Regions:
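Conserved "landmark" site that anchors the functional core of diverse proteins
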Residues: 1-313
Length: 313
């Protein structure tokens, strides 16, 4: 009752929704970069909302099912096959013992999520399976290691009686230009009006310097007069403005404190879109209404968590 990894690709990680309550001692939450895709993959299989999955960055990826099960694939637009027969993303499928799943490079997007019925099982570290390489925590080894060829991931074999697919209106398009909503917090009101105008009116480009810790952007520099700050806690999606004026958006594996001035935070909805952005993608920022963002988040949490547990217990 396991999945045998034949080709892990450059970065495949066991992830759940992350570990919380330890940022005060320098432990980042980690967790799935694109929670929209993650949630839907579990939802398709009637899994607990926090059931562990494999986050596959880029690909290629190849694995063999050692036991019959239902599985789901959500996220990047990628060609995937089961025993050479094409399968559809954002839907559930069934595999028999010995079936081989193969995935190529994404046509659009960056990260795919592979879920199995019941979730992958592995010992927790600080309450989570999530892999954080920089903290050497979680994953199959409990030491923050990415998945490797030959790894065997256990799961409880379950076959769902019905195949399901995500309604089309909930499947995102990964575009070359994306609009990112910003909650204007932190030092936003200390920036000059000219700096704010630059931030919201200019296009910024995703550079090749992106990882699970943060996304570095390039565009017209944003000026900030103050040079020294006391380090403070870093929220998910915080937009730092370092000395060169080029924004850095901090992601799931971010450091827990930092001293750069910050324009605010990317709203949860658009962090998922950003997590799928590849180098060269252009970003246009806009000011996101706080109450609207809260309502969207509460609606999402109500749908995915209601009666569905927190998983991996």
């Amino acid at each position: 009752m396991a999945l045998d990894i034949i080709q892990a690709g450059p970065l495949s990680l066991l992830q759940d929704l992350g570990r919380y309550g330890y940022q005060d001692v320098g432990v980042t939450p980690g967790g799935a970069m694109d929670t929209h895709a993650f949630h839907w993959a579990n939802q398709l299989l009637n899994n607990p909302a926090n059931a562990a999955q494999i986050e596959i960055t880029m690909g290629p990826f190849k694995a063999c099912f050692k036991q019959s099960t239902s599985f789901a694939l959500c996220g990047a637009d990628v060609v995937a096959t089961l025993n050479g027969n094409k399968i559809t993303s954002w839907s559930s499928s069934q595999a028999k013992a010995g079936d081989v799943l193969e995935m190529g490079y994404p046509k659009q997007g960056l990260r795919s999520y592979l879920a199995v019925s019941g979730g992958f099982t592995s010992p927790k570290t600080f309450g989570s399976i999530s892999t954080v390489i920089r903290n050497k925590l979680g994953g199959l080894s409990k030491k923050g290691s990415k998945l490797a060829n030959g790894d065997i991931l256990p799961f409880i074999a379950q076959v769902q009686p019905h195949l399901r697919k995500v309604p089309q209106q909930f499947i995102p398009e990964y575009k070359d230009i994306i609009n990112i909503g910003v909650l204007t917090t932190y030092q936003f009101h200390q920036f000059s009006e000219e700096a704010k105008k630059t931030f919201f009116n200019e296009l910024y480009t995703v550079t090749p310097e992106i990882d699970r810790m943060g996304y570095r952007l390039k565009g017209k520099p944003i000026e900030y007069a103050e040079q020294s700050f006391v380090s403070e806690g870093i929220a998910l999606g915080a937009i730092q403005i370092p000395a060169n004026g080029q924004p850095i958006i901090l992601m799931r594996d971010r450091q827990t404190i930092g001293g750069y001035p910050k324009m605010g935070c990317v709203c949860n909805r658009d962090l998922n879109i950003l997590a799928q952005a590849t180098p060269g993608t252009q970003i246009r920022f806009f000011e996101q209404d706080l109450y609207e963002a809260e309502a969207e988040l509460h609606q999402e949490q109500h749908y995915f968590f209601k009666g569905n547990g927190d998983g991996n217990d």
